């Protein structure tokens, strides 16, 4: 046989530990933000060590044999030094960048989350149809008509900047003579509803829209769609989405002026489909990946109106006055707050008052992302973060995505379906967001030039000597030395004016920690492997988007190859409801 020593290991950084320490603070009515980072980190380290000790003794009592006197912990000084060294390989190669783009964001934890830190749950949300008045168009019939958008995130309407259409989608201008006008007439809106109002909508979705708005009056039994609304006249206009180029609408809250008085252009989006909704998609570059890319390509930038805790900025125009009255309090709730988005909430109330709310119901069932730790809903939020690019050309050829996809084909997966699972995830994933706005973790050890833009040459300091000083200090003192007084001057050394540089205090995604284990366990330990490659990685199927995934990306980025030859995936023992058993769910 062959010697296969078991090296016990623990991931020690991250949100689960912080969450427990913060719970202790809350019981004592302490504010975490008032505690110095070094003190908070010391408490997190002590908490993690306590449970490392408890679990070690429990596993030994079970008769599990391993190198208990020499485990690996991601919070050990040498581990933290290696993790930083691996990060600096990305930085020095030009494969680390700072950018602003929508990322998964937890308003409860006030940090960005990776896909592996998100769980999807079935929920019921508010769905609304909103009318945007068309003010300009090369098609005369559209001027004065209303474009209809559908959304399940009413809270994003105050930061709408455009409307997307599908170039190949068939659209119609429907004469709304009875149903919705009748609906609006009982809402106290300010817009006159007498006479016919024309609504622009994708033809394949008109029936669905009419069902959603409970408009059965305008239909003729057995008649074609062209007779909806007005039994005498056909649609006022019918055409392809590509005909809508140059069309402009105005925001339903345009009366507020400022941001809301700006025109809302119609933009072509290849992501617009007729699967659901209205075939017209409201665009907010702050809160959606497609929105961000399409708007930025057309000169529309994020406005950063939603803060880290999920509330609109106090100076945002939609909030208006009345900080202390009920009107003001209602608008200062977190956007994930259910009443905030309800048909009776502030968004819908304002749209109803403007005569723009065509339907509102809180009965839409769908799958929605939640934080794996707090179990609270997450949002897409545009924030400055640090990323590893998936599609940038790497030295030696290929991209991180193409390298990983190639290595996935070489690795043996047991069962075989694991290859397809991880492959589909890598193939479609966005750039890897590495930064977290938390305290307990390996710091993202970067310095950036004051006053420079992320796109400027020299924005990020890529000096191997500076990086070596950081790694040497971490090896003997641990990552806490990054937070010590005078750390910036110490690490920059005599070659740089510390006043010209800013020190980054974000921490690394914990999946980068665990993804680096091949370096500080397999490569660096005396009992590791000669080539730094594991014969087998074995974990549950959830790790196709976790440890297997991050390890593959990390190793392909620094070594150009997979860190393992075989991946074995096991199943889970489930509870009586079919849920995975875990301490956080309380079902173990």
Per-region residue spans from a language model:
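Residue patterns forming the tRNA-binding/recognition surfaces of aminoacyl-tRNA synthetases
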Residues: 2, 18-158, 177-178, 183-189, ...
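Carboxylate/His-rich catalytic cores and anion/metal-binding grooves
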Residues: 4-15, 171-173, 180-186, 193-251, ...
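Conserved phosphate-binding loops in nucleotide/dinucleotide-binding enzymes
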Residues: 121, 283-286, 499-506, 528, ...
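Active-site-adjacent "gating/activation" loops or surface patches in catalytic cores
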Residues: 257-267, 503-532, 565
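Alpha-helical support elements that line or immediately flank enzyme active sites
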Residues: 289-296, 550-559
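Catalytic cores of enzymes that engage adenine nucleotides and/or redox cofactors via long glycine-rich
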Residues: 425-430, 438-447, 485-489, 502-511, ...
């Amino acid at each position: 046989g062959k010697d296969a020593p078991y090296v016990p290991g623990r991931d020690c950084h991250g949100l689960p530990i912080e969450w427990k320490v913060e719970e202790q603070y809350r019981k004592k009515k302490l504010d975490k933000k008032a505690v110095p980072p070094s003190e908070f980190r010391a408490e997190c380290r002590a908490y993690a060590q306590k449970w490392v000790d408890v679990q070690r003794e429990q596993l030994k009592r079970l008769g599990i044999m391993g190198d208990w006197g020499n485990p690996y912990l991601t919070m050990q000084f040498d581990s933290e030094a290696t993790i930083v060294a691996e990060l600096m390989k990305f930085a020095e190669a030009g494969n680390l960048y700072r950018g602003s783009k929508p990322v998964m964001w937890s308003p409860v934890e006030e940090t960005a989350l990776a896909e592996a830190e998100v769980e999807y749950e079935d929920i019921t949300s508010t769905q609304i149809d909103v009318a945007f008045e068309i003010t300009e168009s090369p098609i005369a019939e559209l001027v004065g008509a209303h474009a209809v958008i559908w959304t399940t995130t009413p809270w994003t309407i105050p930061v709408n900047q455009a409307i997307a259409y599908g170039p190949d989608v068939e659209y119609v201008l429907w004469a709304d003579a009875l149903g919705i006008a009748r609906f609006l007439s009982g809402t106290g809106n300010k817009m006159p509803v007498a006479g016919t109002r024309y609504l622009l909508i994708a033809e394949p979705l008109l029936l669905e829209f009419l069902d959603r708005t409970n408009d059965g009056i305008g239909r003729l039994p057995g008649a074609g769609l062209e007779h909806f609304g007005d039994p005498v006249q056909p649609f006022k206009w019918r055409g392809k989405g590509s005909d809508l180029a140059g069309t402009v609408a105005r925001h339903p809250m345009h009366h507020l002026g400022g941001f809301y008085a700006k025109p809302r252009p119609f933009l072509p989006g290849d992501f617009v489909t007729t699967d659901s909704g209205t075939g017209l998609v409201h665009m907010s570059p702050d809160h959606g990946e497609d929105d961000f890319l399409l708007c930025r390509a057309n000169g529309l930038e994020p406005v950063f109106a939603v803060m880290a805790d999920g509330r609109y900025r106090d100076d945002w125009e939609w909030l208006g006055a009345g900080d202390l009255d009920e009107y003001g309090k209602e608008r200062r709730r977190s956007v994930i707050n259910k009443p905030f988005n309800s048909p009776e909430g502030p968004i819908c109330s304002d749209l109803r008052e403007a005569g723009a709310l065509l339907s509102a119901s809180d009965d839409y069932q769908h799958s929605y992302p939640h934080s794996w730790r707090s179990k609270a809903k997450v949002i897409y939020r545009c924030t400055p973060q640090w990323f590893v690019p998936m599609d940038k050309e790497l030295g030696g050829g290929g991209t991180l995505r193409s390298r990983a996809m190639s290595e996935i084909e070489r690795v043996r997966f047991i069962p075989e379906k694991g290859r397809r699972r991880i492959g589909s995830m890598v193939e479609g994933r966005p750039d890897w967001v590495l930064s977290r706005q938390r305290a307990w973790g390996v710091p993202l050890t970067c310095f950036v030039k004051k006053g420079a833009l992320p796109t400027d040459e020299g924005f990020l300091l890529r000096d191997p000597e500076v990086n070596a000083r950081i790694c040497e200090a971490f090896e003997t003192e641990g990552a806490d030395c990054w937070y010590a007084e005078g750390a910036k001057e110490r690490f920059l050394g005599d070659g740089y004016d510390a006043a010209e540089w800013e020190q980054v205090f974000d921490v690394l995604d914990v999946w980068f920690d665990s993804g680096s284990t091949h370096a500080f366990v397999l490569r660096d330990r005396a009992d590791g492997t000669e080539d730094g490659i594991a014969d087998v990685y074995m974990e549950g199927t959830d790790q196709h988007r976790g440890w297997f995934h991050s390890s593959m990306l990390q190793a392909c980025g620094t070594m150009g190859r997979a860190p393992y030859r075989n991946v074995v995936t096991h199943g889970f023992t489930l509870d009586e409801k079919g849920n995975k058993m875990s301490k956080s769910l309380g079902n173990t």
